[in-house]
């Protein structure tokens, strides 16, 4: 009598890798045939929750399609394949189970936030109806949630440093899962499904901007190549702490984040490679700092587990009642990179053109939107969700809560000074000139404050404020301390009157936002 093969369906989501993948590892050990499955869930390609921005923008979609394509190639080399379907996972799985007839289990990695856990609940319900096993694992963090040195997730500290010290002294990182040279095969007769195109999602395939700091492709293969390059071929990891606040080029930071977001590389694998590098090459503050940043990623994921949907609420984790604004003209100026503050504008244009922005840039543009403009932080968070190639729900919302002063920042009223930050991290103005071509003829650090230039300097730079480049839509009093003073106009004088919140420059206070972008104003 022929015994039917045991088939296990492996639903892959943000774990698009073969290495250190407990879902595939468990299925390989417990099935005769396995079905790796990725679903293009239509719920990922609609509008965001509050402001209806597209959920998945062209840069991340491109990276996702590349990652899916790469994983399929890798699985084929191992004697398997990746099934691709368009549809809700719970419905696709139910159809597959009925089609195959001998599925014994469905397995997947758990996520932390509501939309993802809702999918898990729906898949579990489908498995219950069908009478098959539902098996989940936790594999997205460096430290496993069951190994945290806290009695319950509700005891997670609300300050990162306390969390970090606890896990570093009391926690242990689990070893990675090793995969065999060959995987169990797929059942016969299954259509593999084609990799969709941008057009299938009513989008255009974005061109690669030659200025981008992230000219990389998606996929596990590319992630592992990047690690090999950054660690072993160039030793760049040994100077990471000194270069991580860079703005231009590929190698100022690890650039692991996009691959981590889709699970193309495992944080535990990075950790193992750091340990190997420290034994064979060198151990210093820079090698430790890579782990330090991975712990931030862990922390925001565990914060999401602790607080649930509150990470998306207007009042944040601290339940603060802040009178946020929803001024569409101010927000448009921010997102389009035409605030008149060059450091903000350069970063926002880089994001729009490439899907990437440095960590330093993200902190600054978030501070500017929330602290200088007073705009609802969720507008910024959802805009990042749309555009970032490395969008990770927990890190994105955790960082925005932090920047807005309603998250895990132990310091009250942290506010970035756009001029000081720009001069500290782009003292020569090279980053400004790269992304704000209107200012290319302004030399040195003066590119950060074009409104402070004399009329002669502006004319020499072929710059007409209010026409070829806008005046700042707000001014913060503290900026004046960092401006290379030229013959001062009333803008500088008003800014030097004292500390306080950012304000519309006094002589234009009542003119409205349209004034700053009109080509016909009489200054």
Curated annotation (Swiss-Prot):
Q: Which cofactor does it need?
A: FAD; (6R)-5,10-methylene-5,6,7,8-tetrahydrofolate
Entry annotated with the keyword Ribosomal protein:
no
Q: What keywords does the record list, in alphabetical order? A: Chromophore, FAD, Flavoprotein
Molecular functions (GO terms): damaged DNA binding; deoxyribodipyrimidine photo-lyase activity; FAD binding
Q: Where is this region: Disordered?
A: 174-211, 486-523
**What biological process terms from GO does the record include?**
photoreactive repair
Q: How is the cofactor bound?
A: Binds 1 FAD per subunit. Binds 1 5,10-methenyltetrahydrofolate (MTHF) per subunit.
Q: What Gene3D superfamilies does the database record attribute to this sequence?
A: 1.25.40.80, DNA Cyclobutane Dipyrimidine Photolyase, subunit A, domain 3 (1.10.579.10), HUPs (3.40.50.620)
> Where in the sequence does UniProt note compositional bias of the Basic residues kind?
496-510
Identify the InterPro entries for this entry. Answer: Cry_DASH, Crypto/Photolyase_FAD-like_sf, Crypto/Photolyase_N_sf, Cryptochr/Photolyase_FAD-bd, Cryptochrome/DNA_photolyase_1, DNA_photolyase_N, Rossmann-like_a/b/a_fold
Entry-linked PANTHER family: CRYPTOCHROME, CRYPTOCHROME DASH
Q: What is this protein called?
A: Cryptochrome DASH
Q: Which organism is it from?
A: Xenopus laevis (African clawed frog)
The gene it comes from is: cry-dash
């Amino acid at each position: 009598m022929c015994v039917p093969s045991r088939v296990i369906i492996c639903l892959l989501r943000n774990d698009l890798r073969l290495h250190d993948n407990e879902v595939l590892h468990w299925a390989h050990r417990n099935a005769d045939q396995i079905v790796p499955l990725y679903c293009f869930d239509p719920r990922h390609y609609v509008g965001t929750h509050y402001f209806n921005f597209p959920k998945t923008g062209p840069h991340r979609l491109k990276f996702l399609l590349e990652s899916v394509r790469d994983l399929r190639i890798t699985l084929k080399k191992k004697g398997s394949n990746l099934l691709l379907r368009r549809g809700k996972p719970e419905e696709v799985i139910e159809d597959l189970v009925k089609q195959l007839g001998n599925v014994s289990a469905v397995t997947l990695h758990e996520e932390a936030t509501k939309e993802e856990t809702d999918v898990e609940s729906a898949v579990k319900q489908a498995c219950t109806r069908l009478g098959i096993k539902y098996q989940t694992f936790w594999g997205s963090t460096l430290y496993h949630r069951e190994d945290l040195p806290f009695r319950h997730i509700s005891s997670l500290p609300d300050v990162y440093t306390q969390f970090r010290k606890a896990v570093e002294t009391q926690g242990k990182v689990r070893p990675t899962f090793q995969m065999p040279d060959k995987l169990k095969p797929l059942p016969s007769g299954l259509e593999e499904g084609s990799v969709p195109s941008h057009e299938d999602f009513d989008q255009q395939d974005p061109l690669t901007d030659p200025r981008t700091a992230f000219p990389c492709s998606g996929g596990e293969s590319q992630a592992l190549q990047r690690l090999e390059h950054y660690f072993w071929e160039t030793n760049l990891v040994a100077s990471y702490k000194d270069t991580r606040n860079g703005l231009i080029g590929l190698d100022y930071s690890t650039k692991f984040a996009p691959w981590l977001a889709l699970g193309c590389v495992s944080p535990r694998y990075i950790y193992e490679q750091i340990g190997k590098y420290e034994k064979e090459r060198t151990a210093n503050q820079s090698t430790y700092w890579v782990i330090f940043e991975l712990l931030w990623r862990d922390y925001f994921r565990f914060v999401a587990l602790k607080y649930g949907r509150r990470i998306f609420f207007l009042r944040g984790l601290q339940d603060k009642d802040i009178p946020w604004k929803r001024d569409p003209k101010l927000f448009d100026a921010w997102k389009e990179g035409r605030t008149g503050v060059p450091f903000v504008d350069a970063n926002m244009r880089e994001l729009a053109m490439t899907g990437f922005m440095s960590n330093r840039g993200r902190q600054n543009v978030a501070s500017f939107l929330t602290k200088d403009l007073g705009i609802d932080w969720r507008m910024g968070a959802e805009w990042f969700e749309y555009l970032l190639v490395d969008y990770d729900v927990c890190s994105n919302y955790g960082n925005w809560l932090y920047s807005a002063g309603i998250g895990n920042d132990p310091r009250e009223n942290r506010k970035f000074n756009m001029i000081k930050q720009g001069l500290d991290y782009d003292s020569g103005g090279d980053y400004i000139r790269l992304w704000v071509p209107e200012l290319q003829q302004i030399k040195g650090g003066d590119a950060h404050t074009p409104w402070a230039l004399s009329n002669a300097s502006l004319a020499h730079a072929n710059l007409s404020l209010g026409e070829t480049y806008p005046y700042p839509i707000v001014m913060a009093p503290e900026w004046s301390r960092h401006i290379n003073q030229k013959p001062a106009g009333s803008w500088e004088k008003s800014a030097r009157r004292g500390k306080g919140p950012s304000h519309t420059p006094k002589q234009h206070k009542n003119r409205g936002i349209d004034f700053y972008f009109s080509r016909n104003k009489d200054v």
